[in-house]
Amino acid sequence: LSHGEPVGENPSPGNKAGGISTLEDKALGCTQKCGKSYVEGVLPYGERLKVKGLNLLSAPGNDLVAATALASCGCHMVLFTTGRGTPFGTYVPTMKISTNSTLAKNKPGWIDFNAGVIVENEPMEKTCERFIDYISPGSKRRIRKQRKERLQRKLRSSRQE
């Protein structure tokens, strides 16, 4: 904003209705969704991903433009959270994740996964497990295998002590 660039309808009317008042608020909220991972890199628009881990992408915040920017840097799937819904998609598989069950119920053609059940008291762990199963059916087996290997390493190291 300090560079005088136009931001148009950003934050969007839906963002504003949800309590986001500035573009900085929106960016911080997006970064917060990444959890506690360290930022490994920042990609300019159109640059390919080179470093494993959490990378931030410097690109416009418009949904369609942002999804296209993600695809241009090598993204295989866009996980798009929404509280109001959007029918857009892009040439990379775009999964829309509802933050409320009303939206998921009213727009089943737009929403792929309902995460709104968390605020209806479904345990976060259960929702996460269902989500991982949904986006990658084989991932549950990989996670179980990784946990088993980690436990086996701990057991071996405790026996050596």
Tell what function each PLM region has:
Residues 1-161:
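Anaerobic metallocofactor- and corrinoid-dependent redox/one-carbon enzyme cores
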